[in-house]
Amino acid sequence: MKIAFHTLGCKVNQYESEAIAAAFEQQGYTVVDEREFADVYVINTCTVTAVADKKSRQYIRRMKKVNPDSVVVVTGCYAQISPEEVSAVDGVDIVAGTNEKSHLTDYVAEFQEHGMRQLHVKGYEELDAYDETGLVVNTENRTRAYIKIQEGCNRFCSYCVIPYARGKVRSRGLSEIVAEAEKLITGGYREIVLTGINTALYEMEQIRPDEAGRLPEEPYGVEKVIAALSDIPGDFRIRLSSLEPAVVDADYVKRLLKYDKLCHHLHLSAQSGSSQVLAAMNRPYDREAYMDIVSTLREADPYYGLSTDIIVGFPGEKEADFEDSCSLVEECTFCKTHIFKYSKRPFTKAASMKGHVAPQVKNRRSDRLHDVGKKSAEAFFAENKGRMERVLLEELLEDQQMITGYTGNYIKVYVPYEDPEAAQGMLNQFVSVELLEVCRDGMRGRMVEK
């Protein structure tokens, strides 16, 4: 039996699709490319924007056309938020919510036996237990592995549907995280990326200040995971997929700087550069608090890599607010700025707010901010010119005779090579590279040692 996957959305979805694939392989399935003929197709959906919903529906229809007799399984956030809408799409056989992914092998077997369409979706208030999908240890042609450490979010930002799609905060057991990391490192992975719906919330519900208001001196929260993984022997590095300034502050990120294996890069989601808009978004920090975190990191390491998310066209966003977002991106010299046009989502407070921004204004602001973000990244790359960086080599661009990889501070580096066989042997290796000049979406470099 053959099974194919199409995954939309975030790194958590990618991780979960790999875990689901591993579970089906244990049942004797062969995983094939989504464009190939398969007996089962799994679409792992996203619902962060209306565009994501539309893409999910398109892929459902597309996969059924490849094999009209296949079993089509739709899971993920869109399936959780709009199960009836997903069920109504022609060709869908099984709809499974976000906390049902570990049961998909059973659901498919049941469908193949009885041929009855299935709907397995709990209400978000019932999503209160971590759904352990098992260890992901596929090491074929890979250098970077993702480990999911937590599920859910309780922040309820006014624009965001994800708390309804993912449920309450649930943290994965530390022993399971360490066991997965050890297997991945033993299997040859050189970079472990810690991911989750809101990684900063890992075990934070258990933390209480003492009577003097002091927080624990020993590692807590996501730092606890970093400390445990740092003790694993081997030549590898750890990367945090993101930290929310809505959860952590400058004092907390300062604690993370002592871990040598932790990459000097952080995705720090701003969402806006305007304190007024941040308040309307129900983000519990202002621009000044965000900049305090940035300053703390850059004072410790002027070349610390930062990336971010910005929403343009949030209800009530004025031109001055938008200019605040532009200036934030300029000042922070982000290595990458992800830009989203505000999209009205079900169940959210922002959907009923006054002052919705016209589509053409959102488009104009998005285009402008893309230009600002590109210049911000180029400025960050230029600051790194002439530096020596340790690069993990990942991919050969044979038609260009380039080998590419990433620095710890998340700069994509292009290094020319002459001997294809030797270059192939350097994949998944750390090498020292001199960063020479801004190039494409990163920098061109010169290898100084193998």
Residue ranges and their predicted role:
Residues 1-202, 218-221, 251, 266, ...:
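Proteins enriched for Cys/Gly/acidic motifs involved in redox and nucleic-acid/cofactor modification
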Residues 72-73, 81, 186-319, 330:
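Conserved SAM/AdoMet-binding glycine-rich loop
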Residues 352-450:
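Terminal RNA-binding accessory module
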Residues 52-54, 168-175, 203-207, 280-283, ...:
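Short, solvent-exposed loop/turn segments at secondary-structure boundaries
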Residues 157, 177, 194, 240, ...:
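Conserved, mostly hydrophobic/aromatic
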Residues 102, 155, 167, 200, ...:
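Glycine-centered loop/turn positions within well-structured domains
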Residues 210-213, 234-235, 350-362:
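Short acidic, glycine/proline-enriched helix-loop-strand junctions
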Residues 140-143, 153-155, 262, 272, ...:
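Short flexible coil/turn linkers enriched for glycine and charged/polar residues
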